[in-house]
UniProtKB/Swiss-Prot annotation:
Belongs to the type II cytokine receptor family. PROSITE patterns: FN3. The keyword Cytoplasm applies. Keywords: Cell membrane, Cytoplasm, Disulfide bond, Membrane, Receptor, Signal, Transmembrane, Transmembrane helix. This is Interferon alpha/beta receptor 2. Residues 17-223 are extracellular. Residues 1-16 form the signal peptide. The chain crosses the membrane at residues 224-244. Residues 18-114, 115-217 form the Fibronectin type-III domain. Disulfide bonds join 65-74, 191-211. One of its GO terms (cellular component) is membrane.
Amino acid sequence: MGPWTLLLLHLPLVVSMLPAPTNVSIVSFNLEHTLTWLPGPETPDNTHFTVQSLRKNSWQLVKGCARLKTRQSCDLTNTFKDPFYHYKARVQAITTTQKSNRSLSMLFYPLTDTLLGPPVVSVSGCGNCPLLQVTPPTSRGLQRSLSPTQLYYRQFTCKVRRTRDGSQFSMWVTSTEKTVIGYLEPGAEYCVTVTPSTSFNPHSVPSEPHCAFTSPTAANTVPVVLSVLCAFSLLVVLLCGIVVYSGRLLCMHKPLPKTLSSVPLCGG
């Protein structure tokens, strides 16, 4: 059997192959993992896709991902449970008569590759020293983790920005207790943004700015009180002077008794 005969025998197999899926990637947010891909060029409309994951050196079918349609994705959250383990996945296009080559994803490490979402932030006012409370978000993937607070949401970078001029400073906070933000200008608006901070995962999303006004400076009432007291004192002195002066006038116009009117005046 010549080489051309062998080539002709294998030609139908080559022609019957489906285009392999492209752009295979694992998207992870707060330990919720999803495998996505695009159909290969000229993939038939009746094509289904099947997903396998690598477990202990063997490929196994992912539950719920055996007959996916175009533009569907595969949920790997229940499959990639251990954040300290590394995983791979592959997808294959299938019809009733054809199959494609399998397309592999990149090596995935949940601990370092997942995107950490923003924490839950609350700011309660206490004058010029607002209280900041930071708690981890909730998700199906984080609930499966052994200790999401200790792993991912233990420390945070808090940026405090004054809206009037854009000046800002940063501080470290934890999720175990409330933090007092001190040394703020009275009567100014400040916005607080909190981002998860870990030494092993650089992928994180900051929270939305939480803005609040500090209390204005209390008015100094001492000068006002002193002014009122001075005015009142002057009024009292003025009234006393008027009373005394009026008494003297009355005494000057009052007629003398007859016994005194007969007494000659000095120099008279």
